[in-house]
């Protein structure tokens, strides 16, 4: 029998590898299974009718990637003004191989003073693991190395689309 198993627990959720559109749905099922209502950021181009209504209903936050205002400040404000706010981020910024991860998730967690919960999806074993949290120290190189090392053993649906870059 094929079953999806989860291990562990733990307010920025960093989910990887992100190699397929299915990752969103699997992630939402996982968060529901652990009793977390999470928000996620997605490029605004996906928020057209009727998909936009669906994405917003399940926690989607449209992001204008060309806008100059600080997304870090916007998300930090959401943390400050919410009793419970959980944000899931896939820092590759795309479903294609990208060794240059976006670092916004790190700066959001640092500024909001919340832990980064590391959540790995492993398609071959049908497992989602959430067994590690990283509290940002301000030493981004050290912290990013620790984060990337956690994800090295996870395989996405399309493993060729996941690149850890230099560890």
Where are these regions (language model features)?
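Single conserved hydrophobic/aromatic residue that forms the stacking wall/gate
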Residues: 2-13
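Structural alpha-helical scaffold elements that stabilize or flank donor/cofactor-binding regions
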Residues: 5, 54-55, 108
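Non-catalytic C-terminal accessory region of glycerolipid acyltransferases
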Residues: 68-167
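Short, conserved glycine- and acidic-residue-centered signature motifs
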Residues: 5, 20, 101-102
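Structural detector of well-ordered beta-strand residues that form the stable sheet scaffold
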Residues: 1, 39-41, 117
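Catalytic core of membrane glycerolipid acyltransferases/transacylases, capturing the structured
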Residues: 11-67, 123, 127, 132-134
């Amino acid at each position: 029998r094929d079953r999806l198993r989860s291990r562990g627990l733990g307010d920025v959720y960093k989910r990887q590898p992100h190699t397929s559109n299915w990752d969103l749905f699997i992630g939402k099922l996982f968060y529901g299974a652990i009793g977390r209502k999470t928000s996620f950021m997605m490029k605004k181009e996906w928020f057209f009718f009727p998909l936009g209504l669906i994405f917003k209903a399940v926690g989607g936050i449209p992001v204008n990637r060309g806008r100059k205002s600080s997304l870090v400040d916007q998300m930090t404000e959401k943390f400050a003004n919410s009793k419970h706010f959980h944000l899931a981020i896939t820092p590759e910024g795309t479903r294609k191989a990208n060794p240059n991860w976006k670092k916004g998730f790190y700066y959001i967690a640092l500024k909001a003073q919340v832990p980064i919960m590391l959540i790995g999806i492993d398609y071959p074993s049908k497992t989602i693991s959430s067994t590690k949290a990283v509290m940002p120290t301000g030493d981004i190189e050290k912290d990013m190395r620790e984060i990337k090392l956690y994800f090295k053993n996870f395989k996405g649906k399309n493993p060729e689309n996941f690149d850890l870059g230099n560890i």
